[in-house]
Every structure is written in C-alpha cells, then in structure tokens.
Amino acid sequence: MNNKKSKDPIQKYPIPPFPKQPQDVPGITSKMNPLPDHGEQSYVGRGLLKDAVCIITGGDSGIGKAVAIAMAREGAKIVISYKDKVEDEDAKDTLDWIEKAGSEGILIRGDIRNEKQCLKIVEKTISKYGRIDILVNNAAYQMTYNSIEEIDTIEWDKTFDTNIRAMF
C-alpha cells in the first residue's frame, strides 16, 4: 500500500486562467506555461503490458506523451508517430522517458494524412518488433472559430484528413 499522503486534486495542478501561449501549431511542450503533467513523476506501472508493441500517433506531446509514458511503464515497446521537425524535441523527450521506464521505442516523423506515411509506420513497426498489439489513434488537429461558416474547405479537409481519414 502507498503510504504517501494524497494531495487534494483541486489544488494539485495549476488553475486557470493561464497566460497566452503564443505558439504556432503544433505547439512545443517546453515553451508552455505552465508545463503540462504527463505523469512523468507520478505514474507507477505494474507491467500489465509487458512486451506489447504499441503505436501511438501524436505520441510526442500532450495526451499521446502521457499514454506513451504510462504504456512504457507497463512494459510495452512504444512506436511514436509525430508530424513535423519542429516536434523533434518533444518526441526525443518522450523517448527519453520511455527509456527511463526500462522500455524501448522508436520515433517516426511524418504526416499521417498521407496514406504512404501510415503504411511506413506499420512497416517500420513490423520490421523492428514483428507485430503490432495496440494502436492508439491520438493525433488530432482542430482550430477554433466563432462560427462554422468561417471554416473554409481547406481547413475542413485538413481536420477530417487528420482526425478521421488517417485512422483508416
């Protein structure tokens, strides 16, 4: 049993309002204020996914990074798919946390809106690990607008190609 005293979850994390985050999309974790909590210091695994092979799209940051760290601490091998060179720092940091968990992983950069990129992710995973056990379709894209009428066709296509089409 864990004898650590629990902290009130309402006071455990930063409370809004947060400062403006002047970043282009995709954002970089190290430039966020406050820094997000991906479970780096808190999640304790129990080996529930020992030797499972997991692909996580968008696994370099945000929810994808938290999932990657948790699955690695559960014993899984992690394949992180992420989109742009600008995300290399976040992806490398996530891989470092995977390795600190005693697991291993690979990074695959490329846009999953491109079907050939999706095939490349599968091929590299099979080549390295021989199988795929878990797929986490986490990568997503969305911009906010005051009205749906403001969304042009290019924006609509980018959103659906990332969030829906890439999964198939």
What are these regions (language model features)?
Residues D133, Y141, E149-F168:
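Catalytic Tyr-X3-Lys loop
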Residues R46-I80:
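Canonical Rossmann dinucleotide-binding motif of NAD(H)/NADP(H)-dependent dehydrogenases/reductases
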Residues A101-E104, K124-N137, M143-T144, E155:
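A glycine-rich helix->loop->beta "capping" turn
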Residues A76-D93:
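Conserved glycine-rich Rossmann-like NAD(P)H-binding loop of the short-chain dehydrogenase/reductase
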Residues Q41, Q142-S147:
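Helix N-cap/beta-alpha junction loops of NAD(P)-dependent oxidoreductase domains
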Residues M1-K50:
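Non-catalytic terminal and boundary segments that flank Rossmann-like NAD(P)-dependent oxidoreductase
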Residues I55, V79, I106-I108, L135, ...:
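Conserved Rossmann-like nucleotide-binding pocket used by diverse enzymes
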Residues D88, I108-I121, T153:
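The beta1-alpha1 cofactor-binding region of Rossmann-like NAD(H)/NADP(H)-dependent oxidoreductases
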